[in-house]
Amino acid sequence: MTAILITGYRSFEIGIFDHKDPRVSIIKQAIRKDLIGYLENGVDWFIFTGNLGFEQWALEVANELKEEYPLQIATIFLFETHGDKWNEKNQEVLSQFKAVDFVKYYFPNYEQPTQFSQYYQFLLEKTEGAYVFYDTENETNLKYFLKKAKDMPHYQLLLLTFDRLNDMSQS
């Protein structure tokens, strides 16, 4: 079994507030290409954390690819309360993250800041690599996860960057 964690920018972090934004289709093209590459190299599990934005778009692509490839999808939420306060539209997305092959809640609820690092350590230990939409030019809290991932020997990291997206949009 080979599992890849999929995470990246949330939609608000890159200024995408509408699913019909033309940038979403370019991002999804890149996701499709990269996920197919993973599947053709033996990956059989895609792991999500349940965030809006990149993960949401990658989940949509992964669900489409299930028709062609034998893959499994899991969502491992940080807290059981994840998304409880989202609006109705986003609740629909949350239900998609819960309608996968495996769902787990790492903690019942928030108690202390160390839960975040424990959660990311768990994800790193349970996956062989990560596919991350991230660019050092636009830093977010993902930088802490990426630092941990880069420090792990043999952990495979594939970054989808703004430069790669620009190249794809021009071709």
From Swiss-Prot:
A Pfam family annotated for this UniProt entry: YpsA
Which InterPro entries does the record associate with it?
A: YspA (IPR010697)
Q: Family per UniProt?
A: Belongs to the UPF0398 family.
Q: What is this protein called?
A: UPF0398 protein SpyM50438
Task: Please give the organism.
Answer: Streptococcus pyogenes serotype M5 (strain Manfredo)
Q: What is the lineage of its organism?
A: Bacteria, Bacillati, Bacillota, Bacilli, Lactobacillales
